Structures are given as C-alpha cells and as structure tokens.
Design a protein with these regions (language model features):
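Solvent-exposed loop/turn segments at secondary-structure junctions
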Residues: 36-40, 87-90, 134-136, 166-170, ...
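Catalytic beta-strand/loop cores that center a nucleophilic Ser/Cys/Thr
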Residues: 204-284, 289-293
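Structured catalytic-domain cores with a bias toward divalent-metal coordination
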Residues: 1-84, 91-92, 96-98, 111-112
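A glycine-rich, often tryptophan-bearing local segment used as a flexible ligand/cofactor-contacting loop or short
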Residues: 136, 140-225
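Structural motif
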Residues: 84-88, 114-115, 130-134, 255, ...
C-alpha cells in the first residue's frame, strides 16, 4: 500500500468539461460518470455509481475481476428489506415504503431493480417488496430469469410483500405471474353493452373503500379502529385458485365495500379478500390489494406485514 495515494472527497459539483480537459492534458487515467436522469429509477442511478466505483477499484488493482456490485452491511441488522423500483413500479410506492421502514427498528432498506435481482442481490436481504404500479410490467421488466430469482428467494425462506400490482405479480392465474400464492384475480373480459368487451380488473380512479381484519389479521397486523377507510386503486379481487402444489392462503382482511366502473362488476368486490397470507417453500408471502402505505395512519399495517414475512 502506498500511503501517499488516497481518495479525496470532493465538495460541490464537479466541472465535467474541466475534468476531462485536465485528464487529457495530464495524460491521466480517469473515469467520468455522467449522472443519469431523475426520470430513471433510483436503483438504476445508484447501480451506475456502484458499477463505476467497482470498475475504478479493479483498474487500480484493489478489487479482483469477480468482485460483487453489492455487499451486505458490516453491522448485523434484524431486518434487511429490498424495495423494487424498476420497470412497472409507480413513483410514490417506493417512497411511501421507505417511510414505513423508518418505523421498524434495526432495519435496512435498499431499492433494487431487475439487473440487481439478476446478479443475485436478493441474497443480501430478508424481504422483498413489490409496490403498486403494473404487475404485468413488473413481470416483463424482471423477465423469466428475474422472476425465477424471486421465486427461488422466497422458496429458500425469504419474505415477499406485494401491494396492488405486487399482489397481481404474486397471483397464480397469469402466464407472467410468480405463482407463489394460491389465488386467482378477477380479470376476465365481459361484454359491456354499447362499449364492447372489457377486462374486469379496471374499476376506475383511486377511491376509498372499507376493510375489516380477521382474527388472523389482528394477530399478524395488529388492531385499529375498524372498519378501516383505505385507498383502493384497481388492486386484485382475489379468489381461491385451487392449485394442489400451492398452500391455501389465509384471509387477513376483507373488503366491506366496493367500487365498480361497469355494472357487471357490481357485487364482485364486497366481502372478498383485501389481504391474504401464505407460504411458498420455506418463505412467507403477504399480498395486499389496497394501499395502506398511502396513509400515515395505516402504515403500521405494512410495517407489521414486513416484519411477519421477515420472521420477526
């Protein structure tokens, strides 16, 4: 080790053009990373920096060729949670989940994307959360290999929380879904007079519905003033899939009111599961159709859900 060589932290914004000119003039070996746009997921922007630093350290001989892009923290924490923010994830969900994580002592949360999952990033976590957005787009972003990685993570004992789109992702009835919980979603197409054939998953814009927990729901998620008034935005309407290879799910909460966009949807949501839990391999799965993470008063439900799938 050469004691004369060390890293210097910079203060303020670097002048990229001046840095390039200086490196060229001095003949210095340099790496310049242009910050990606804010429209890109945070996990992707952070990943770019990690990859750059790894490349730099490999270039100067500090790291070997097989060095990972992500490592576990030195301090052992009670709960390490990965929050998916890649393709198909909405913008507010990950932010709200980060607020939820602040209420869980001795925990760490980190945003991850499809590339991280493909590289084995889930090995560093106890729980993965897939937030609202689009379940099919999340599945497409993951690809077959990425979805297999998520399934393997849960099968080995990892925890999975799916909210709205994430609950669609966990379902058993799509070609692209993970099939980690034994429920179907109400997504068939029906003929609407004067409109044509429409899929039944769409029930209109964001709205408020009521939800009531079961005895099992109280044990896992805690108690509050019920029925809960909770935000709903086209989350899955769940019913048993009856797949022999999967464990039956347990209902933790029921919808006690409904919203519908088409008359044929009337009566198909009220008294159906709002929250279910199940097992997949050695792991735990918890799917939430509405959005408790959107309400500061209801975030404790999500915190309890995360702790439960994480084995705490």
């Amino acid at each position: 080790t050469d004691s004369r060589k060390h890293f210097l932290p910079l203060r303020g914004t670097a002048n990229g053009s001046l840095t390039r000119a200086a490196a060229e003039r001095l003949g210095a070996s340099s790496l310049i990373l242009e910050t990606t746009t804010r429209e890109q997921p945070l996990s992707l922007r952070v990943r770019q920096h990690r990859v750059m630093v790894r490349t730099l350290l490999q270039e100067i001989g500090i790291l070997g060729d097989g060095a990972p892009t992500l490592t576990s923290p030195k301090d052992r924490l009670d709960l390490r949670v990965a929050i998916y923010d890649g393709g198909g994830a909405g913008t507010s969900g990950p932010r709200n989940l980060e607020q939820v994580m602040k209420t869980i002592p001795r925990s760490l949360n980190w945003r991850i994307g499809p590339a991280d999952i493909l590289e084995g990033a889930l090995d560093h976590f106890d729980v993965v959360i897939f937030p609202g957005g689009s379940g099919s787009k999340q599945a497409a972003a993951l690809g077959i290999q990425g979805r297999d990685k998520v399934r393997e993570f849960i099968e080995r004992g990892g925890g999975f929380v799916g909210i709205c789109a994430g609950a669609y992702l966990a379902a058993a009835n799509y070609s692209w879904s993970l099939k980690i919980c034994n429920y179907n979603t109400f997504c068939e197409t029906r003929e609407i007079p004067g409109v044509g054939r429409k899929s039944m998953w769409y029930r209109g814009p964001s709205s408020t519905v009521t939800m009531q927990l079961t005895t099992e729901g109280h044990e896992i998620l805690g108690r509050g003033v019920e029925p809960f008034h909770i935000r709903y935005h086209n989350g899955p309407i769940m019913s048993p899939a009856g797949i022999p290879e999967l464990h039956d799910y347990q209902v933790l909460g029921w919808f006690r009111s409904e919203v519908f966009h088409y008359e044929t949807q009337r009566g198909t949501m009220v008294n159906t599961p709002a929250i279910v839990s199940g097992k997949f391999g050695k792991g735990r799965v918890l799917s939430i159709s509405p959005h408790p993470e959107s309400s500061q008063k209801l975030r404790y439900l999500v915190a309890r859900a995360i702790r439960w799938v994480g084995g705490l």
